[in-house]
């Protein structure tokens, strides 16, 4: 994940900025599931993004919640939006069954360090994807 984020920050993002004349003060990065985890972890790699959002971020990966609780993000001034469901992980018999508790830990940590806007809804991981994305995009419009 670190290599991906470094490539995004050092190669892909500069190329996009050059090609499309993007306003570097209003860049947002977000994703769903593993993409949400990647967007969240970008907070420790770069301060290029003014807003970061994660929908059902895969915070259950080993060591992720611990890292987020123990380290202050490089981009602590970013606007952050996290949304997870209380039924994420239902039906699994591995560490995924605790997805909700990992999400709670990450939400609490990023509220403390970044003032993150957090939403814990009543749904599972794959439920209401369009609704969740629309809520996140409305949030991005408000904060940027």
Feature locations, PLM:
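Non-catalytic cap/lid and distal C-terminal segments of serine-dependent acyl enzymes
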Residues: 1-144
């Amino acid at each position: 994940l670190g290599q991906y984020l470094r490539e995004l920050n050092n190669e892909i993002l500069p190329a996009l900025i050059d090609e499309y004349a993007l306003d570097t003060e209003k860049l947002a990065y977000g994703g769903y599931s593993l993409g949400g985890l990647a967007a969240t972890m970008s907070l420790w790699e770069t301060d290029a993004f003014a807003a970061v959002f994660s929908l059902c971020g895969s915070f259950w990966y080993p060591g992720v919640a611990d890292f987020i609780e123990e380290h202050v993000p490089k981009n602590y001034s970013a606007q952050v939006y996290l949304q997870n469901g209380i039924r994420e992980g239902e039906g699994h018999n591995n560490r995924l069954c605790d997805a909700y508790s990992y999400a709670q830990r990450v939400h609490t940590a990023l509220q403390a360090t970044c003032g993150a806007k957090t939403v814990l809804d009543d749904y599972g991981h794959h439920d209401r994807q369009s609704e969740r994305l629309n809520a996140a995009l409305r949030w991005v419009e408000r904060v940027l």
